[in-house]
Structures are given as structure tokens and as C-alpha cells.
Amino acid sequence: MQAPAFVDKVVLHALTDNVLYDTICTSFIRDNHASRRGKGTLDAIVRLKGHMVDYYRKNGSADGWVLKCDVHHFFASIDHDILKAKLRALMQKRGVDMAFYDLMCIYIDKTDGLPLGYQTSQLLALMFLDEFDHYIKEDRGCRYYGRYMDDFYVIARTKRELQFLLKDIERWMSDLHLELNSKTAIFPLKNGLDFLGFHSYLTESGACVQKLRRSEIQRIQTRVKYWEKAYPAGEVTREAIITSFVAWDAFASYGDTYALRLKYAKKVSVIIGVDVKPRRKINSTRSVRALRRVKQEQNIRRKRGDITPRKDLFQPEPRPDSIPPWM
């Protein structure tokens, strides 16, 4: 898969900011988290915690089931004809000059699937499954659904319900010339859920705990071992180590990881001879309450007939939708 030339990226960046973003994102559901202003990994993690806690409160226990899906080679498998048909219909509906559509088609047809170097690829990929999102949330009534690009989950009361849903999802994917990969599975909610680098699980009291996955911990372990040898040998600078660790610490702070981050901050401090401190813990419980408060206020205004949009009380900092920054 090829990355676009620099000039192509500049053109697409301008097109995305001035035309494409508002055209495409208007219809997205709340639980479509990637590549959008005010969204990102933190928003998805906080939203998952809210879903799990809300499920426990409504059902009185963690006796539920999870369907976890992942689309196989998503970007590389996106069908150009289907994508362009969706984009054309959307632009016509929004009254966008079709010259922009013609320009987009030139870039789309440059490679198979969607090239990872295009800024617009993220939005086009989200749009490709937008109709699917609405089907899951509205037609199937799946309250506890979340998607981050090609990775999504559904929480339901029974395994049978999710088995039927999975058959529908497979038909949807087939119609889009996509397929789910082997990681797709149905399992008890009590087992917890791996999503975006964190393992989220419910305690007996109904609290949701979010820890870094073992694979993510192994990444920082490997990196620290490398620094222990490379820094004294002059193969890596102090500034590079600090930059890399701070990026990892920022990501890890999305979960309940303060003790873990403090442990590795001390290791890094010993290596470089400078006191490194982890970020303060993010109060995601407060974030969940803020999201709930926004929803309650929206319901009150809706009952009063006041549908004037209001800025959310909770706006997490967006993160780049790319490879983790410490890689």
C-alpha cells in the first residue's frame, strides 16, 4: 500500500477541513469514536466504562455477554465502487459541488482499498460503515455499542441474542465485500473486554476497572530494557527517552494505571538521572458523570421542545488516530 506524495496530502488536508469533514460527520452516531473532533481513544474508553456501569445498574449484575468484532484488513479491503456510491449519494444530499466528488474519486482510485497516508482515508473509512452503525444502534436497538474504526463491541443480556446479531453482521460485511477476522468472539461480560489497549472489567460492586493489556505493558518493558543499554552507550538521547515515555504515560493514564506508570517513571529516572513523574490520574468516573449529566440535560430540553444544540460539558482532548506515539 502506497502513501501519497506531500502535495497530495496538502490538497487532501484542505479538502478535508473545508468540505469533507462537515459533509461526512453530520450523520455519524455518538458511539463512532475515531478521527473526529472531541472524540478519540479517551472518549471511547470513557464511553465503554459508561456502558458497562450502566449495564450493571440496569441489570443488577455483570451477567451479560459481549460480542467483540474486528474487520479483517479493513482499509485494504474497502471496495471503491461501494465507497464512491456512498460518497456521491451523501454529497448530493448535502448539496456539495460534485467537482469535489470527482476530485475525491481521483485520489480514491490511486490504490487498492484506502491508502493509509491520506488524511481523508480515516473519514471515508468511518463513512463506509456509517449505515451499519445506524442499523446496529437504531434498527437492532443495541444500546451498548461502540466502534473505533474497524474495532467494535456490543453488550447484551444473552448469548443467543448476540449469536443472531453476529449472523446479521456477517451478512452486512459480505454485502460490503468485507469480512470479520478470527479475533471475533462472543464471551461472558464477567471476563472483561479488551478494547483499544485496555482490559475493562466490572467488579462485584459494579465499578468498572480499566487496566493496560499485558501486550501494552510488554511494550514499555521492552523499551525500558533497550534504554538501559542504549542510553549509556550514547545510542539514544535523554530528550528522546523523555519524549517517548511521556507519550506512553499519556496513553496509559487513560486507565487505572497510576501505580504501573509510577513504577516505570522511577525506572526511567534511574536510567537518565533526571526525576520523571507520571501524569496525574484522569478521573474517568467524573467524566462518566459529566456525560450522564449532558444526556439528562438534553432529555430535559427535548421534553421542553428546546432542541437548540448545546456544547457538551465533556470534551476530551483528541488524540491522533494512528500508531501509538511511543512506537
Can you name each region flagged by the protein language model?
Residues H13, Y107-K110, Q163-F164, L180-M327:
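Right-hand nucleic-acid polymerase module
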Residues T16-K68, H72-A76:
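Active-site-proximal segment of RNA-dependent polymerases
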